């Protein structure tokens, strides 16, 4: 459990730089992805830090065991992957998160549909 700030000081913000950093970290390896994503969410929703700022991104990368220089060197490749992912999502008619498209093309959207997704994957739906 995290004590969230429902109206953080820096929301809405530009989440793109943090998203690019997550992709760059995934490509680079060597750290803990779960800790990185949790750290970015915590920075925004608990610590009220601006996740669009390079210093915040560097801190989150370093705390999760990644090279903080990815905030500089990796963002371009992260942005390219992000754009490609966005194009694929639009082509698949994705319109929210979480959103899952299974091999049959059936879509599951929303936290409240994860149980249905589990049933589908188990062959029970």
Residue ranges and their predicted role:
Residues 39-125:
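C-terminal cap of thioredoxin/glutaredoxin-like
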Residues 1-44:
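Structural alpha/beta surface segment adjacent to cysteine/selenocysteine redox centers
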């Amino acid at each position: 459990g995290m004590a969230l700030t429902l109206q953080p000081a820096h929301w809405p913000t530009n989440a793109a730089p943090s998203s690019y950093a997550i992709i760059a970290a995934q490509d680079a390896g060597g750290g803990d992805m779960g800790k990185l994503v949790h750290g970015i969410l915590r920075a925004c929703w608990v610590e009220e830090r601006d996740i669009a700022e390079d210093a915040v991104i560097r801190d989150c990368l370093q705390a999760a065991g990644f090279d903080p220089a990815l905030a500089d060197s990796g963002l371009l490749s992260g942005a390219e992957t992000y754009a490609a992912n966005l194009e694929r999502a639009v082509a698949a008619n994705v319109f929210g998160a979480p959103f899952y498209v299974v091999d049959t093309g059936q879509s599951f959207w929303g936290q409240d549909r994860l149980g249905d997704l589990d049933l589908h994957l188990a062959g029970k739906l």
